[in-house]
Amino acid sequence: MAESIARPSVLNATDDDIKNLLAADSHIGSKNLEVRMENYVWKRRSDGIHIINLGKTWEKLVLAARVIATIENPADVCVISSRPYGHRAVLKFAAHTGATAIAGRFTPGNFTNYITRTYREPRLIIVTDPRADAQAIKEASFVNIPVIALCDTDSILNHVDVAIPINNKGYKSIGLAWYLLAREVLRLRGNISRTTAWEVMPDLYFYRDPEEIEREEEQKAAAAAAAEEEAQLAAQTAAAEFEVTDSAAGTVDPTILDNATAGQVGQTTWEGDAEWNITGAAPSEWA
């Protein structure tokens, strides 16, 4: 077994970091074991699954972050993931650290054929899986580009300079690895403090199923439609309270008229008054 790497205590993993790694199944390897990954294995379970030593994982995460932080131009760091589980993670890593992301199929000749439109000359590349990203590692070896890789117990370490032992098959483990790597890089650069928590949550780096996203959008649309329907129903109910449904709309209520006339005293017309029927003689001369 290799001895632990000496490093300042400030770079040690916290209890929360180890708990997150355990919760994401970052320590679960595979049944196959590459001989050069044997130093990173803690034990082998009865079912044949190899358990990764998370202490070694954290050491290599810190080492990889220190290597990345030495690159003056962040855009010279190229992060690659051919596997769908790592697409979102590398894009978020690139957004937070300024690196260049290649999410999806790696076009052959990106690092070696300068005629192609996608030709790049990075100073460092980071891959999610040495098997899936073998073409990128092969081309990097041709032009002497250092390689950092997330390696499972069955990963081939040919042309890999820094291997981070971790479960690179689960989407939570992949997302958490990229999250911790980005956070450590930003801390080493001085962009964020070690004493305060980073406002970005780890699940932002996790892979999301497109069907799940569609279901969430449908649920939001249904909720918005239901809220709009309730608002329209409430408006119709409020308007119905002010509507006149009687056919005598606009006429005087007879009961109100009876009450008004019941209190009158005497004649209600002038024809019944004798004084109003006397015709006066017109004056014959003016004084």
From Swiss-Prot:
Main subcellular location of this protein, as a coarse class: cytoplasm
GO terms for cellular component: cytosol; cytosolic small ribosomal subunit
Molecular-function annotations in GO: structural constituent of ribosome
Subcellular location(s) of the protein: Cytoplasm
Domain of life: Eukaryota
Entries under InterPro entries matching the protein: Ribosomal_uS2 (IPR001865), Ribosomal_uS2_C (IPR032281), Ribosomal_uS2_CS (IPR018130), Ribosomal_uS2_euk (IPR027498), Ribosomal_uS2_euk/arc (IPR005707), Ribosomal_uS2_flav_dom_sf (IPR023591)
Any one GO biological process: rRNA processing
Disruption phenotype: Deficiency of 40S ribosomal subunit formation, this is likely to be caused by insufficient 18S rRNA stability.
Residues recorded with modification Phosphoserine: S46
Transmembrane segments: none
Pfam families for the chain: 40S_SA_C, Ribosomal_S2
PROSITE patterns xrefs: RIBOSOMAL_S2_2
Keywords: Cytoplasm, Phosphoprotein, Ribonucleoprotein, Ribosomal protein, Ribosome biogenesis, rRNA processing
Quaternary structure note: Component of the small ribosomal subunit (SSU). Mature yeast ribosomes consist of a small (40S) and a large (60S) subunit. The 40S small subunit contains 1 molecule of ribosomal RNA (18S rRNA) and at least 33 different proteins. The large 60S subunit contains 3 rRNA molecules (25S, 5.8S and 5S rRNA) and at least 46 different proteins. Interacts with eS21.
Family statement: Belongs to the universal ribosomal protein uS2 family.
Protein function: Component of the ribosome, a large ribonucleoprotein complex responsible for the synthesis of proteins in the cell. The small ribosomal subunit (SSU) binds messenger RNAs (mRNAs) and translates the encoded message by selecting cognate aminoacyl-transfer RNA (tRNA) molecules. The large subunit (LSU) contains the ribosomal catalytic site termed the peptidyl transferase center (PTC), which catalyzes the formation of peptide bonds, thereby polymerizing the amino acids delivered by tRNAs into a polypeptide chain.
Further remark: There are 2 genes for uS2 in S.pombe.
Protein name as it appears in the record: Small ribosomal subunit protein uS2B
Species annotation: Schizosaccharomyces pombe (strain 972 / ATCC 24843)
High-level lineage: Eukaryota, Fungi, Dikarya, Ascomycota, Taphrinomycotina
